[in-house]
Amino acid sequence: MFKLPFMPREEKFFDLFESSAHNIVEASQVLKQLVDTWENVEPRVEEIRELEHKGDSITHEVIARLHRTFVTPFDREDIASLTKSLDDVMDFIDAAAGAMLLYKVGSPGKRAKELADIIIQATAEVEQAVLDLRHRAKLKQIFDRCVEINRLENAADVVYRAAMAELFEDSTDMAHVIKWREIYEHMESATDRCEDVANVLEGVALKHA
């Protein structure tokens, strides 16, 4: 199979990927502050919502640029998949925060804090992997970052299962169970989407490293 000796340069795509990745890092940091302190709840949820809107704008710009660019830095399908996966991470962080406010759940417990910690770590790895994408010499580093993202996603699965078991065991209030089940699902899904990002990045690195 013919392989290009270098990745064609369209630097604006990399700028947009990096902006999107940094955006989800910022959102994960606000989510962690929200979960850890349970202070300034509405302003923090609104801050995440504004970051989600910013993420949508970045996504739309990538897609528009994709339609009008003849030579892209890597496969168009991979660009679209990466863009969607990054946007999905943001959407689930926003959904988790929004549900906490909407349902008036009160101060989050241990499992929500553990999931927020994992989301922080996973989005940080995603951002670093996206930064590596711009530099051909660093493409091989993406593989190690993807392994770590996969490990974090597995850790989130463990916490999620423990959270669900405790939720059904400890509460007789079904409304409480339903609310927190949805929140936990959104938080765990954010790590799933980080893994989707990792899978796309790993594929790009395999093609071009």
Predicted regions located by residue number:
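Cytosolic, long alpha-helical scaffolding segments
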Residues: 1-209
